[in-house]
Amino acid sequence: DYQTGDNVISPLINLNLEINDNDRLIIYGKSGSGKTTLLNILSTLEIPSNGSMIFADKLIDSLSDKELSNLRLNDIGVVFQSHHLLEEFSLHENIILPGSIAHNLDKDFANFLIEKLKISNRKDHLPDQLSGGERQRCAIARALINRPKLLVMDEPTGDLDRNTSDEVMELIDDIFNEIDISVVIATHDENLKFKPNSKYLLEQGKLNLIQG
């Protein structure tokens, strides 16, 4: 909940969501439905004011800031609609940065991601030298570099045209088939090329299962 003037706003209402190992979930919702709030909670960027979140047997609101930071670095990957790449770093440097920070960089896995996402010929380019699809593929590789247990994606292809969106989703779907990871995607795009095992609709803060 948050306060706006005299009103208390509840972006999410009586929401229960369980994510199991290797789950593939998609959450549809229009702008203002609460998608971003939900994904911020799943990625521990926000702590719910009511209720609780448990991740890997850890009660999130009981963790210190340092513990939350380590959890995000090692166990939760996040991809936003905007790529948030560091403009002064090359594509390759952006991808390996979280691994370097965590002191557990797997160079072979980095090369695997770069090859799978078909950006190996662009690895030395800066973000402003890349296409929108290439920048987003870089952001996806960066989110996966530490082999997180959970990948959270907020409108991951929202800035891309249909053909580029389909291409990016096909490439990452291929990666998902080769690694152990749970994936949650929030989108308004009902034609997103993704094969979930569960589909949800988020409307006015209420989450409803529509398939799965």
PLM ranges: what are they?
Residues 51-59:
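Conserved ABC transporter NBD signature motif
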Residues 3-5, 96-107, 116:
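ABC-type ATPase nucleotide-binding domains, specifically the catalytic core motifs of the NBD
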Residues 126-136:
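Conserved ABC ATPase signature
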Residues 145-149:
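A short, proline-enriched helix->beta-strand linker immediately N-terminal to the Walker B motif
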Residues 151-154:
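Catalytic Walker B motif of ABC-type/P-loop ATPase nucleotide-binding domains
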Residues 89-97:
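Short coil-to-helix segment of the ABC ATPase nucleotide-binding domain corresponding to the Q-loop/switch region
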Residues 43:
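Helix-to-loop junction immediately C-terminal to a conserved catalytic motif
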